[in-house]
């Protein structure tokens, strides 16, 4: 597999290099040189396969012979060890539930596949994963790499800005997992990660790698569950499929669009954000004008400068698709709460991120179409807000219950690179 740097097309790397480096020169994102396509017949045949076999086939189309098929399938089996069911919400709407993994969020798919790829590629070489999280990434990455040999993980998160349960899920592990609460917002955490990757000495000393949705292995893994969703739908809905994606860093939407470029029948996508609506405003008037990030109920989407957007634009350019074909919506907190109550009346307990996606979908779905919205996290991960909004008590799934009483092991740091650098050099 060959990939190129979106900021410098002359920088070309293999899959292994892209996974190991995370980012290219000047913080450029890597993008596949070849965009494979399956025929309609091949797609139909693939949709009959089981999740793991099909996923290995999809990933192999991108990765090629860099990783032998049987090793790839074995690694996929280890990564995707849980289902991605479509729950029926209304006669014309389903929710693709991506929260049945160990940390109850969609990031388990990408995080675990990336961990499998990195450990396969690195062999005996030590690696340090540095990533920023607004909640779910941290947990997924921590659990994916926990206890794996030769890997150290450092996770930055905005202090007091993620739910207490989210914090318990990944800040109680210890071992090879180091968590750092930063005095600042998610964008401040992202900025620290960028500074670290610009520090050549630190990069070399620690074998630095990023683990957020910019890593190509995570992005490729996420393509697979779109195929799994379509495989569960009745034949007659497949050609009228509209998918609404709750969007923060836009990795999930990028993966969905890549699935479409492979030949998966998706009529259109909707990018659903909260009031951090840089992309909806851009799609509306062509002006890219990020505002200060606002805290919302759907906190994993509190991102005003989405990292993956350049990949979306590149895919549209390469496929000669029109950006105006992409649906969009920005949903405020009041509407989010109202929508969660509506879903509850339909017999479906949801959380803020999925509610944003459902709202956008319901408002834009035409008669005769079938809508899917992505359920990116288990409602219990947002227990406090979900209980307050719905006025009912949620049971904690065992994954959360067993961590609820453990002590937090995080370091507290200011949003200051020198302090972070010192911590990382001292703990290598």
Curated annotation (Swiss-Prot):
Domain of life: Bacteria
UniProt note on regulation of activity: Is competitively inhibited by L-threo-3-hydroxyhomoserine phosphate.
EC assignment: 4.2.3.1
UniProt keyword Lyase, yes or no: yes
Essential cofactor(s): pyridoxal 5'-phosphate
Catalytic activity: O-phospho-L-homoserine + H2O = L-threonine + phosphate
Modification type N6-(pyridoxal phosphate)lysine: residues: 107
Role noted for this protein: Catalyzes the gamma-elimination of phosphate from L-phosphohomoserine and the beta-addition of water to produce L-threonine. To a lesser extent, is able to slowly catalyze the deamination of L-threonine into alpha-ketobutyrate and that of L-serine and 3-chloroalanine into pyruvate. Is also able to rapidly convert vinylglycine to threonine, which proves that the pyridoxal p-quinonoid of vinylglycine is an intermediate in the TS reaction.
Family: Belongs to the threonine synthase family.
Name of the protein described by the UniProt record: Threonine synthase
Organism field: Escherichia coli (strain K12)
